[in-house]
Amino acid sequence: MTSSAPQQGDSSRVRDLRIAIVHSFYSSATPSGENQAVADQMAALDRAGLKPHLVAAHTDRLSRSPLYPLRAAVTVGSGRGHSPEADLRRLRPDVVHVHNLFPNFGSAWLSNWDGPIIATVHNYRPLCAAATLYRKGATCTLCPDGDRWAGLRNGCYRQSRTATAPLAWAGRHGAPANPLLRRADRIVVLSEASRQTYVRAGIEPGRLVLVPNFTSDAASPKGVGSGRRHDRVDAPWVFAGRLTPEKGLMELLVRWPASERLDVVGDGPLLEDCRRAAPRAVRFLGAVQYSELRERLPSWRGLVFPSRCPEGAPLIYPEALAAGLPVLAFPGSAVADSVREQGTGMVVGWHEPLDAALSRAADHFHSLRPHCRSVFLRHYTERIWVNRIANVYSDALAHHAAVREVPSGGGPRVPEMEPRW
């Protein structure tokens, strides 16, 4: 399964906890679903009365220093450098929830921290320098399979061996030795595919907890799911995401029928290549404001999701469902798995005639809109997420207390597992 059934947890059990959220924010020059997810989760925890406190590092600010590339490389490679520990000592939280340390926070502080830690893995960075498990048009698992220096040889991070070197060095012992994953009492994954990937890489299954992303229903236009027709016969399809190789847009465009309209929302290094490959019926809208995208989602015929890599759980999927928008996905991603399992659209193979697939999708996507809304309400609302994460916090506290009762000679110890693929 790609999304767990809603848990009827009671967030009041942990309402008096002080929760510290640790996150290294990626550059605002590149729209980040992970940054958005952290902001949404902070707001949701606050509304639920769970007292979250953000401990953050911002690439936008730190990168102004001419020495930033060197400092970031040393931090990533050695685990030493900028640390959230002083802020955490001041806050004295009951639970620390880490979303991202890369590249601005070190990891050395983890061995000094005595309280419960939860880690959310938004991508595959502990297994792959590029964080995508994707290379040269296909899924790549060379590094987690045991060839630890494959990423360095291929310059997988930013197409540069120099930039990849700190990541390769930090990950040379595999995922079980990753300081954050080794230390965490509970590790939150966003999809069943992600959970299975981390288990195969050697992470203890009992510490992995599936908590899918949510999205706020407040951002959905009024009337969505009411039965009122939002899609027109001539409405275009939409792609929304970064224009990078692993997103699959180039492969989609060379197959896209000239008679079908497609709007491309997003920007990235492949923009000009995509423009050259696109038929005339494709419009490039560029990056749009988050609120505008949410407002416009119901007006498209369907979301096209051609990702070529095993993405964890992009926010665009629950956002589409909140808008009552069905999804046309291609195999290989967690979104395709969810579409199959939840019946929220159609999965089409790369070798199938795309014009025929689009015609079939157009015939029944309108009737799927109420169902997509229903799936959103059952699996991806803020309330459901808060209950799930409250259960995780409660379990982490209990686990940490149990571990501390057992003499360990120096803090929590997690059984190591050999990677099995």
Q: Model regions: which residues?
A:
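A conserved mid-protein helix/loop that constitutes part of the nucleotide-sugar donor-binding site
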Residues: 36, 40, 235, 239-257, ...
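A short, well-ordered alpha-helix in the C-terminal region of glycosyltransferases
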Residues: 366-385, 391
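Acidic donor-binding loop of glycosyltransferase active sites
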Residues: 298-312, 325
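Short hydrophobic beta-strand element within catalytic cores of glycosyltransferases
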Residues: 305, 317, 322, 326-329
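Short acidic/histidine- and often glycine-rich active-site loop of Leloir-type glycosyltransferases
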Residues: 317, 331-342, 346-347
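Conserved acidic donor-binding segment of nucleotide-sugar-dependent glycosyltransferases
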Residues: 341-352, 359-366
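Nucleotide-activated donor-binding/catalytic signature segment of Leloir-type glycosyltransferases, i.e.
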Residues: 272-294
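Donor nucleotide-sugar binding/catalytic pocket of nucleotide-sugar-dependent glycosyltransferases
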Residues: 126, 141, 145-222
